[in-house]
Amino acid sequence: MTILVGTASWTDKTLIESHAFYPPNCNSAEARLRYYTGIFPLVEVDSSYYGMPSASNSALWAERTPAGFVFDVKAFRLFTGHQTEPKCLPKDIQADLPKTDKKNLYYNDVPAPLLEVLWARFFAALEPLRAAGKLGAVLFQFPHWVTATPKSMAHVEHCAERARPLLTAFEFRHESWFNEKHRESTLQMEREHGIVHVIVDAPSDVKNRVHSLWEATSPALAIVRLHGRNAQTWSGAGSAAERFNYDYGDEELEELASPIRD
């Protein structure tokens, strides 16, 4: 068994501005990535959640990293049911959208032909990483308002089919997916589609979280994501940096290491 450890993004603004990780001479995207790969063998690309990724960037990432380095890539926010401002879409897609006064769009607000284009472009953008053997899992994070209903299950399975044959991971943010009624059916769905079940560590006594369920649903991979245990900022209106601002202690890490090894 191989265990890879990495961070969610190597270009996070707060990480760079903290001056706690990168040395002073790492002041370009290339330098930061090359330095990062000397510390960690894995990274999660989160820029692909906020905007569509590009093949040119993927090619540069593949070129600037050593053999065996792995990129997990977050799925674009529109695909996972998140609200998406039109400006987050490519300009040609924006131009072809139906006229609307909505500030935010959701998946079903976008015409099917345009969705086809977005899916195709998303996976084409990952091709340089796949071809280089450096693409890990494509991570779909479903927000807490995507609950375990037949409609949501249909969309989740739709995402699984669209991502095939790439290795795909699902992270659910609403507890209904793993409550007594739906836990087994959710895990069975993941197994049937070869989906990697994402195990989440987060504050224990807060809303809008799924409690850790230590299950492996894919023979290829298991993912554990550490969100931190900062209960005070978890449900607040602050930034993501504030929400996830947490340093795990040695005892907490050892507590997590045991089930990971198992």
How would you label these PLM feature ranges?
Residues 1-262:
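Residues lining hydrophobic/aromatic ligand-binding pockets adjacent to catalytic sites
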